[in-house]
Amino acid sequence: MNFTTAWALHPQLARDTVPLGDLALSRVLIIKDANYPWLLLVPRRPDITEIIDLDGVEQAQLMVEIDRTARALKTVTECDKLNIAALGNAVPQLHVHIIARRKTDEAWPKPVWGAVPPLAHDAAALDQFMNVMRAKLWVS
């Protein structure tokens, strides 16, 4: 791994998300699409595109953070299903999607990508969601 390069969030992820906070390894972000409660975990390591690019300790930490975040999101949203994926086809920087799905959402049962146009968050609802998620995740 190359730790000489400073970590920076990919510009596309910066445009498409709202920061929630940091866990030990990952930055937690909220996708700007109110159609779904949709979080991203982005390990704060430079030049990482795959989970296998992380060392074993970091891989284990990422799995702990995925578990922690997914459990918190499921509890907060009472969703029917969680979709968890690290795709990276459009944005090469390693990021893990954790999406709360409901059988009543517009895309169900298909994938969320491109199913419906993104819906802007209501500011008050987003603030409330952020506060509840922070409390569940103990994010600083």
Descriptions of predicted regions:
Residues 1-140:
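HIT superfamily nucleotide-processing domains
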